[in-house]
């Protein structure tokens, strides 16, 4: 169906956004899947529309937000009564959030945009309940709103909305079961529905009323979407990267995906950071220093997304690489900077970067024969909130000086 609103209907929807109270928001990590699927379903016979969509998606992933705004505005002009253009415009706002999750001032704009897309899809589905495009964009709007709520620690609303969103995903899958892009959504559900209860026991009660997942099947489905998806292959590859890195601990596969994505989108700070993280996990210290050193250069150049939080991470890992190479004086400079940045950034609680940088400073002091200064550092670490085994390490080095 080629459905269009008249101008009056679009204006009415826009006016409603001024007063509409957002409903309970969506999804645990399970329901990131509608968002990816919505992006996947720009199915159209219009080659111009298709080409514009691909161009805009690439611009978003490469953080070319101004260019993407212009590109997706063309979608709105081409099809003002369909949700695609409005949804993708909000994806620009989403990536503005993603590259700096501590910054909340884009939240309201994003939520309002997703509400508008949901309203538009509901109006289409009221007349045509089997409209696949409307189902996917509605699922996308719900999923991305929930994803933000999950990041903002509103887990109850996320789980409740995940329950609401699941039937939308199932309906869309039944309508188009052979679409490889859909496998991203079903794969995400299958994977995370099994993983979350074991990885996050506190969230287990929130998942009692949703179907059980299948970790292996989900991973296979996401991999297929990554290889064969038309529009969702990038999202699927990024998801696979995160899964291999955080849950499967397969750092070789994660590293390959990170460099593949970064090669295609060389201005994407998240893909860049994962290259460095994976090199660290693989134990390649020269590569760690090279990747995070380049990130430091981009921070100094003021490149988009390369903010103080990124600088802190890069500085910490560069410091570690120098420490491994016994460049202790240079490593101290990096750890001092990491501590300085942490004191600026840690507004809620002490971060792992602050804890570990202070622990490393103490170890270096020991290695330099500055025992009294080292002991003072370990006392500082013990006074901080524990991160991993930081207290055990500090107590150990209090009794026995660190050695190389």
Short names for language-model regions:
Residues 42-51, 59-71, 81, 89-178, ...:
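Short coil/linker segments at helix-helix boundaries
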Residues 54, 88, 95, 137, ...:
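"A position-specific structural signal for the A-helix of alpha-solenoid helical repeats
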Residues 63, 153, 213, 248-249, ...:
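Residue-level detector of the short coil/turn that links helix A to helix B
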Residues 76-77, 119, 166-167, 226-227, ...:
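Amphipathic alpha-helical segments of tetratricopeptide repeats
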Residues 82, 131, 179, 232-233, ...:
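Residue-level recognition of tetratricopeptide repeat
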Residues 95-96, 144, 151, 192, ...:
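Register position in tetratricopeptide repeats
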Residues 166, 170, 210-214, 219, ...:
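TPR/TPR-like (Sel1-like) alpha-helical repeat modules
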């Amino acid at each position: 169906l080629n459905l269009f609103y008249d101008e009056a209907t679009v204006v009415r929807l826009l006016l409603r956004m001024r007063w509409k109270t957002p409903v309970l928001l969506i999804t645990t990590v399970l329901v990131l899947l509608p968002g990816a699927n919505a992006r996947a379903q720009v199915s159209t016979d219009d080659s111009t529309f298709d080409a514009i969509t691909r161009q805009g998606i690439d611009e978003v992933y490469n953080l070319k937000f101004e260019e993407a705004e212009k590109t997706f505005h063309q979608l709105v002009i081409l099809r003002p009564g369909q949700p695609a253009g409005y949804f993708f415009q909000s994806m620009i706002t989403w990536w503005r959030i993603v590259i700096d999750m501590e910054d909340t001032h884009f939240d309201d704009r994003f939520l309002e945009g997703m509400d508008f897309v949901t309203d538009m899809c509901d109006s289409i589905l009221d007349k045509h309940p089997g409209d696949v495009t409307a189902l996917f964009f509605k699922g996308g709007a719900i999923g991305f709103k929930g994803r933000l709520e999950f990041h903002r620690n509103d887990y109850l609303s996320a789980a409740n909305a995940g329950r609401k969103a699941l039937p939308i995903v199932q309906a869309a899958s039944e309508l188009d079961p052979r679409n490889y892009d859909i496998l991203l959504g079903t794969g995400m559900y299958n994977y995370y529905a099994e993983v979350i209860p074991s990885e996050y026991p506190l969230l287990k009660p929130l998942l009692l009323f949703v179907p059980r997942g299948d970790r292996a099947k989900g991973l296979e489905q996401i991999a297929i979407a990554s290889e064969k998806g038309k529009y969702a292959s990038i999202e699927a590859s990024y998801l696979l990267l995160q899964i291999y890195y955080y849950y499967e601990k397969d750092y070789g596969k994660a590293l390959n995906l990170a460099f593949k994505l970064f090669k295609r989108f060389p201005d994407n700070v998240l893909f860049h950071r994962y290259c460095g993280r994976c090199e660290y996990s693989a134990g390649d210290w020269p590569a760690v220093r090279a990747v995070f050193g380049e990130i430091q250069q981009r921070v100094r150049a003021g490149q988009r997304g390369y903010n103080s939080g990124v600088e802190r991470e890069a500085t910490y890992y560069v410091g570690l690489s120098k420490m491994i190479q016994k460049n202790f004086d240079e490593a101290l400079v990096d750890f001092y900077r990491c501590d300085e940045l942490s004191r600026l950034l840690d507004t809620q609680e002490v971060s792992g970067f602050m804890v570990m940088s202070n622990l490393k400073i103490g170890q270096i002091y020991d290695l330099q024969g500055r025992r009294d200064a080292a002991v003072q550092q370990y006392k500082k670490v013990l006074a901080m909130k524990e991160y991993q085994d930081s207290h055990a390490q500090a107590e150990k080095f209090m009794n026995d000086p660190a050695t190389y």
